[in-house]
Amino acid sequence: KSKVSSIVQAKDGVAVKAGSETYKADYVVLAVPLKALGQIQMTPSLSGTQMSALKGTNYGWRDQILLKFKRPVWDDKSRLSGEIFSDQGLGMIWVEPALKGGANVLINLSGDNARVLQAFGDRQMVDQVLIRMNKFYPKMRGAFAGYEIRRYSADPGTGGSYLAYGPGQVTRFWRIWEQPLSRVAFAGEHTDALYPGTIEGALRSGKRAASQVRDLYAGKTPVIEGAPMVAKAEKVAAPTTGGEKKNPFAWFTRLFD
């Protein structure tokens, strides 16, 4: 697999370069996190506001640690499927079945818990987690067999777990990724207006992007859901009549006026 390095648009199509290969298409749906998007050379280039969003939008801190054990060290009555919360920096804990015997524990570290452990190397991070877990299950260190770590916050392709707007960022960057860039439509949880940072937002964005590509192919101007109606509502002070279609998202939009 090769990373996409450039996307060049022409009058009749798009050329996507990945490694030494170039792929051509009529249209492209770009569903990569903002961190990855910032590493792709776009022609034509992104707008100034979009470039600012690439550099300034916050992403949540998130790491995952998979601890492997020779055997389960907890009793059958223990419920570890996301139901253990700790103030010792452990986050949320799940039991995951191993393919060949043994047992695995998946630990999700997020927020400050993940941020603090960035100062540790992989093995140091695992040791810190084992020390804390061993207080609950004293036989855990003796049954420990290995680990795997995924640092989403430090991953150059993700830059974090999901979109997490900071102060002032909603006002500056909300809805800017809903508008296609010529033949390129943007998708992903970070592009959804109502549910950013969620699976539902990602699904909604895919539906929107597909609809936009369909409109572009048909020679139509893609319509941003709710945008035309919101603009009309701002110009007309009188209440809507029964014959007019109300904007279902107006209440949410007014929160940021």
Regions found by a protein language model. Give the residues of each.
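A conserved short coil-to-beta-strand element within the FAD-binding core of flavoproteins
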Residues: 1-14
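Short hydrophobic core segments
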Residues: 4, 22-37, 206
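Switch/communication elements of ASCE P-loop NTPase nucleotide-binding domains
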Residues: 8-11, 23-30, 65-67, 72
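Conserved flavin/dinucleotide-binding core of flavoenzymes
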Residues: 13-15, 40, 61, 76-254
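Glycine-centered tight beta-turn/hairpin loop motif at sheet-sheet or coil-to-beta transitions
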Residues: 18-20
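Flavin (primarily FAD) binding-site architecture
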Residues: 28-49, 66
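Short glycine/proline- and charge-enriched loop/turn segments
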Residues: 44-51, 163-167
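Central beta-strand plus flanking loop segment that forms part of the substrate or channel wall
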Residues: 49-77
